């Protein structure tokens, strides 16, 4: 089926089993595996009436195209993965924290950003449909399960989505080396959507024009930039830190 895509490894498969088991079409388990993690997968799959097939290592290697699968591969129905941004925003119990990826095309970077987003409690990751990496097996593997837990929402018109976020009272904060304030000397808003630009070119002009703030990340060494997932982790962590301090003062 065109909507099916593989996921592999215990992190990705277990996260999908617990978060969205109805989207799993079938699982393949390596013959002879009987360790605790494999038994857990088999038990959960049986409870959810998911088809399980046992296959040799060569078959699993072929399915995963040589990637490290740990003896477990699944196929999911990607059409059951869709999440609406409005539903996310209207069902939050705290101010929204979003991550916007403007043209991140490397699946390894997307996977790392999703993993970072999960760790920092990001409510959704948003990206334009064009010129962005899509969810695939590589992304799921790198994300270590976060691709199954963090809503990844692609939009046809990013500028329009940014305007809609502002209507919810969410500040759009861009990361830029020439930002008017640096990360450690700015008072960050409670409701925030951080924008990370393309690995090579940064944010697109129209995206930049929709930002309410431009913030730079201080650099103390000789390199001029960091991996996008590292930068995302820094700004999201600082946002969480400031929230904690504000709550302690209440």
Swiss-Prot record:
- Domain of life according to the entry: Bacteria
**Record carries keyword Isomerase:** no
**Which InterPro entries does the entry link to?**
23S_rRNA_MeTrfase_RlmB, Alpha/beta_knot_MTases, Ribosomal_eL30-like_sf, rRNA_MeTrfase_TrmH, SpoU_MeTrfase, SpoU_subst-bd, tRNA_m1G_MTases_N
SMART domains assigned to the protein according to its UniProt record, in alphabetical order = SpoU_sub_bind
Q: Name one GO cellular component term.
A: cytosol
Offer an example of a GO molecular function term for this protein: RNA methyltransferase activity
Pfam families xref list? SpoU_methylase (PF00588), SpoU_sub_bind (PF08032)
Q: List localization entries.
A: Cytoplasm
Catalysed reaction(s) here are:
guanosine(2251) in 23S rRNA + S-adenosyl-L-methionine = 2'-O-methylguanosine(2251) in 23S rRNA + S-adenosyl-L-homocysteine + H(+)
> What's its EC?
2.1.1.185
Q: Which PANTHER family match?
A: 23S RRNA (GUANOSINE-2'-O-)-METHYLTRANSFERASE RLMB (PTHR46429:SF1)
Q: What is this protein called?
A: 23S rRNA (guanosine-2'-O-)-methyltransferase RlmB
Give the organism the record lists.
Neisseria meningitidis serogroup B (strain ATCC BAA-335 / MC58)
